[in-house]
Amino acid sequence: MNRPPDAPRSQVPPSYGFHCVLPPQDFAQALVRVTAALKAEGFGILTEIDVQATMKAKLGIDGPPYRILGACNPPLAHRALTAEPDIGLLLPCNVVVREAADGDLVVGFMDPVAVMQMTSNPEVAAIAQEVRARLERVRSALA
């Protein structure tokens, strides 16, 4: 990662994803906005993991709000599964909504192009490009 040592974590994306910082709002509002923006690009939410609640329940650790949304675009997922049946090991696309240490609300998107590089299937690579374009539009709609 090319992050300067003093750069806030919420401002530099990892190589396996990309993100945006939301305008000020409460966490529940952010989840609604993210879900609606994903829906506008054809994604539904298959799973929602409340990491904050899980860490509290399992480890007794208090942490900031943090949700992992398992987003899926069924037609694109079907194409990928048809091209490579075991690609389900890399699905769905995770989208993280979290509160950063500086109080920013950050939305992180798994980069399907980076993740799907594990396969050498050109059809899967093309689908990953399409998924990334949709997720980038979601990011633009949220910023």
For each predicted feature, which ranges?
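Terminal, regulation- and interaction-focused segments at domain boundaries
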Residues: N2-E41
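A generic structural signal for well-ordered coil/turn residues at beta-strand boundaries
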Residues: P14-Y16, P65, L91, G103
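Short amphipathic alpha-helical/adjacent loop interface patches that line ligand
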Residues: L31, N73, R132-L135
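Short glycine-/small-residue-rich flexible loop motifs, especially phosphate/cofactor-binding loops
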Residues: T35, Q52-A53, E136
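Residues at alpha-helix termini
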Residues: A40, A57-K58, A141
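Compact, glycine-rich, soluble single-domain proteins
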Residues: G44-V96
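Beta-strand/loop substructures that line and gate deep hydrophobic ligand-binding cavities in soluble
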Residues: V96-S120
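Well-ordered alpha/beta subsegment
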Residues: Q117-A143
